[in-house]
Amino acid sequence: MRIVLITGISGSGKSVALNALEDAGYYCVDNLPPHVLPELARYLDEAGQRRLAVAIDARSSASLDEMPGLIRSLSREHDLRVLFLNASTQALIQRFSETRRRHPLSGSPSHDANVGLLSSLEEAIERERELVAPLAEFGHQIDTSTLRANVLRTWVKRFIEQNSNDLMLMFESFGFKRGVPLDADLMFDVRALPNPYYDHELRPLTGLDQPVIAFLDALPIVHQMIDDIHAFLMKWLPHFREDNRSYLTVAIGCTGGQHRSVFIAETLAARFASAANVIVRHRDAPVDVDASSRLVTEVDRP
């Protein structure tokens, strides 16, 4: 049986991900107590159901300590995939304010006896981060701070379509001025490279546009940077695989996330297309966010 476990921070998009999996034919359960999961999986497996998706969050806080051992046990018996959704505190506060929904931990006792009840939304969010943090290492993290729901649905579809035996390698471009990605495993700073932004004709374009590609492709220092990152990853990818890592997010950052990081992320994704399942995401590039095939693109293998 294939089991997709969705966890992470409340407000980060778990319901969107669960709905996408339901549309893909999964039997979906929200807020399942962790200790019930093995029994449910056995029951559905015996009934002929081959796809199960479960969302678990801080509402199950009393059982969260059981999750690491449970994940290891289920991984031995099933095709288990763990998706950890995260978002910045600012983005989460905005989402809760817009929906006027109460955070699951609002009004709950603080772990600090001097604080008493968690009175503010920000306190509840930070407490939840502490509770679910141990689960992040078991799955692939997605920072949904800037993602629209339709883009997250597309990413979830990519996630479940990948071969479970392959390493999923995501190259994510971003701009430092908008903050670093929460989901990055490795991060490379390419701000030392010449910036197309200072060419007025290139400024409104992105690293996906041919004039910017031609500008950067003609610079030896850009290729040196790409070669160095490529060599580093080629050396260490086998070690990540030996460590049973199924997912690796490589973040490439420039100032605005529009030109250099986009070009380098695309170039590296093409180089690694035959070595792993590769996805490239451009977090901050001003591309059409409704055209998810550009924002979250699976690189075709040769």
Swiss-Prot record:
Annotated keywords: ATP-binding, GTP-binding, Nucleotide-binding
Biological function: Displays ATPase and GTPase activities.
Residues reported in the UniProt entry to bind GTP: D57, A58, R59, S60
PANTHER family reported in the protein's UniProt record: RNASE ADAPTER PROTEIN RAPZ (PTHR30448:SF0)
Binding site residues for ATP: G8, I9, S10, G11, S12, G13, K14, S15
Family according to the record: Belongs to the RapZ-like family.
Cited InterPro entries: P-loop_NTPase (IPR027417), RapZ-like (IPR005337), RapZ-like_N (IPR053930), RapZ_C (IPR053931)
NCBIfam families per the UniProt record, alphabetical: PRK05416.1 (NF003828)
Stated name of the protein: Nucleotide-binding protein Bmul_0520/BMULJ_02739
Recorded GO MF terms: ATP binding; GTP binding
Keyword GTP-binding: yes
Gene source species: Burkholderia multivorans (strain ATCC 17616 / 249)
Top-level division of the source organism's lineage: Bacteria
